[in-house]
């Protein structure tokens, strides 16, 4: 006999756990009739009892299964298949019963209308805005989305403030970012794709100007500029026009605008011609192949047309100005031998800086020195001139002698850790420069030069003469000549001052006290120099203006030195711009110089040669005929005269 299976505690209370409290539904239809439904209906009860009976059968089946497993082991697979089939059948029966219960409940529950949710107003407004956008705005928005995808870090999404980047507003005068560009597109401020392209370039260049090349912002701006220029290239835009509908509409609207503008400006004859040209261009573009050669040819043809039309307009304007001048202007060429050296093919030229001192006309031996001759080129990313720094390899480090004091016989006498020359060379240097006090025959270069007469000084002067082409010796001669004259002048001034003081004392006794004070004050203010006497009031005003301009120039120089001597912050590449005080002083100096130059002739300000050189005008040298001088004839004539004069005396 098999062992009787013990009933589990959970099986005893299965019925109590399975039964749930039925739900009660109260339905009001028409305001009077009330129908009550409860989940404890007959169909539901029957299904409930069926589930219980199925559960009991399932338990009995488990028991039988165990008994069979103990008795029969080989036929397990067939029994499993049968069980699976029976379980599937029971599951289907359960699902059918549950579906029937749900249908009964749906019949008693009143029908409720499901209204669609209200659409938000923002979406409708956004759709209206999208519908109202012009083809140009849609095209620009499409390009902006492509450009912003190339900025995953969102460095250029919002404007940069001085709080984020110190001194940004002082360096970058025209900031730009993606949000500002979007706002411009929304306000319809862009008239073409080229304007968007210019603003995109400005945004990237601003970041590259403010940040150093080693920063991530500089690298991100450079990468964004490279990829953005590919997106905004003509080939990419042409491909977008072929693939997107509103890009093709963009070309039509632009042509219509050009036609209306041309017709409104009064160019009726040219309007019809442009329409024909535009229609022809559209037809050619429709049948044109996308080859690069054809595109280049079409571009060249358009550029030639544009240049020819511009030249015709310029000729018409010149003719109109000549006619309106009333004979003052003519088209004939001037019969002059002057020409412009720096004249460009389009007829324009450049104006150089006017400077009265010229190396050709000015003093002999004068040579202008430019800043580029004294210093090299500025490195990229460096905002200051590099000072002179001696190379470490050129520096000589001798052996260092050590002194430990007494009782140090076995200690090392010298240290050659950092020396780059030998001990013998170090001893030679120490003996020559007089640094070693132990040697009795030590001497220095200064003592050697003092005791060896003037030969080294002559060598140094001759070397300087070779370098300056004789300028050093001339300057020494001028100094020697000016020294006795200066001494004589100082002596004369001292005697004149003493005489004036002696003259002031007796005259002061005779004159009134006010005159004494006035003369004493004049002597103090002028430091003994004679007071300036002007011929007219205009000359006095002119001199005052010059003095004021000199003072303003000094103040401007001090302000500039103060600004340029301050160390810029490390995050700034460019120098700080001029301050408000510098701008104000420069404006005052300019106004004063304008007033002064208006009161004099141009020849007093600058020479004719300087003006011509600044404008790039070259005057041909005069043709020299038989202007050579026979030196032999001139030398023979005085000999004849001398013999003629000496003849009577000799006779």
From Swiss-Prot:
Residues 58-69 have a biased composition (Basic residues). Disulfide bonds: none annotated. The modification N6-acetyllysine is found at residue 328. Ubiquitous. It is found in: Nucleus; Chromosome. Residues 131-235 form the Bromo domain. This is Bromodomain-containing protein 7. The gene is Brd7.
